[in-house]
Regions:
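Active-/binding-site microenvironments in catalytic and ligand-binding cores
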Residues: 1-82
Length: 82
């Protein structure tokens, strides 16, 4: 599975351009599985094509600025790339 392969690489963040890495009932357990490995999922990213600039992959620095709310399992955050 791709997610477990990424976790083995000791990444910090998984960014996706959709509502999650799993659908329905599988969504919360997978988010927790990643969080248990100190990896957080940033969902609903847009303009990823601008980062790739036509390339199949790109190296970049991604900065996340989560908003601090209590009592939530997911937090809105701002994302900036340089």
């Amino acid at each position: 599975e791709l997610i477990d392969a990424l976790l083995l690489r000791h990444i910090s963040i998984i960014g996706v351009d959709c509502a999650g890495v799993r659908r329905g009932a599988e969504h919360p357990p997978m988010d927790q599985h990643c969080a248990d490995h100190d990896v957080f999922i940033v969902e609903n990213l847009c303009h990823l094509g601008d980062v790739l600039q036509g390339r199949p992959f790109a190296r970049c620095h991604v900065h996340t600025y989560p908003m601090n709310f209590t009592g939530m399992t997911g937090l809105p955050c701002r994302v900036a790339v340089d």
